[in-house]
Structure formats: structure tokens, C-alpha cells
Amino acid sequence: MNVTFDLTPPSPSQREALIATLNAEERRILLQHGTEAPFCNRLLDNNQLGTYTCRLCGLPLFHSNAKFKSGTGWPSFFEPYTHTHIRKQHDTSHGMIRTEILCARCNSHLGHLFPDGPPPTYERYCLNSVSLTFIPTGTLLPDQLHRGDNTTYRT
């Protein structure tokens, strides 16, 4: 199913309201490009069918059918919901060279992309659980920005 989502960034007032819903750990990771500890995050062992959306703006980012056990301690996916929903950025922090992945709509930090995933893409999108909200199959996707693009689509 081809569904189009509005990728226009939240207005400053919308962004402020969304940020106000975050706890300190979510702010550290989503806004300050932090990383949660491995093997102790809430979505690592989630095996339910559904869609993983951006914790801040609700944009669909990954589907459960692309999730796999990477053994790294973070939820991992071999492809995004759609490539237009993910923004990639060169990251040289902490003495490493990596590809950071961000939400294409709100620019929240999600995690990193590595070239060591399974077929068919051989990519591993390594995500922070706190960057994501899991929406079970059959549930309406959230519409945090009140744009109406998520309200008619069930996961």
C-alpha cells in the first residue's frame, strides 16, 4: 500500500509542544544525539507485528517485517518503512566514522546505519528504543502534528 505522509517539519510551536512530552532520557537521545545502553531497552525483544514510528513526530520509520536479531543489544532493521522517511548524516563523533540516521520530518536522532546487515539489503539500521513508538498491526497510526495523514492508515 502506498501512503503519502507530509514530511514538512513541525512548526516551532508544534516542536516545542512535542518536546514538552519527552522525558529527560528521550530528550538526551532524540535531541542531543545520545545512545541508550545496549540489551536493556524496551523494544529489543518485541516480536509483535506492527509499525515503529518516530517518538517525537509519529512518522512511520520501520515495519516489524524488516526487524531482525543482530546481537548488538539494540533493535535492528534491514530496511526502513520508506527511504524518504529517513535522513542520513555523516557522523565522526566519539572517534568513529559512522552514518547517523534521523527522522526526515522532525530531525530527531534515531541511531546509526551499518553495512553489516542481512540480505537483501546488507544494511543494519541500529535504533534507540526511546526514539521509537511501536504501533501494533490493526491500530491507527498516531497523528501528533494533526495533519490528517496518519488518521486513515492502520499498521
Swiss-Prot record:
Keywords (A to Z) from UniProt: Metal-binding, Oxidoreductase, Zinc
Cofactor(s) needed by this chain: Zn(2+)
Comment on bound cofactor: Binds 1 zinc ion per subunit. The zinc ion is important for the structural integrity of the protein.
Binding site for Zn(2+): 54, 57, 103, 106
EC primary class: oxidoreductase
Residue ranges constituting the MsrB domain according to the UniProt record: 15-137
Active site: 126
PROSITE patterns: MSRB
GO MF term list: peptide-methionine (R)-S-oxide reductase activity; zinc ion binding
EC identifiers of the protein: 1.8.4.12
BP-aspect Gene Ontology terms: protein repair; response to oxidative stress
GO cellular component: cytoplasm
Catalyzed chemical reaction(s): L-methionyl-[protein] + [thioredoxin]-disulfide + H2O = L-methionyl-(R)-S-oxide-[protein] + [thioredoxin]-dithiol
InterPro entries per the UniProt record, alphabetical: Met_Sox_Rdtase_MsrB (IPR028427), Met_Sox_Rdtase_MsrB_dom (IPR002579), Mss4-like_sf (IPR011057)
Domain of life: Bacteria
Family label: Belongs to the MsrB Met sulfoxide reductase family.
Name of the protein in question: Peptide methionine sulfoxide reductase MsrB
Organism of derivation: Xylella fastidiosa (strain Temecula1 / ATCC 700964)
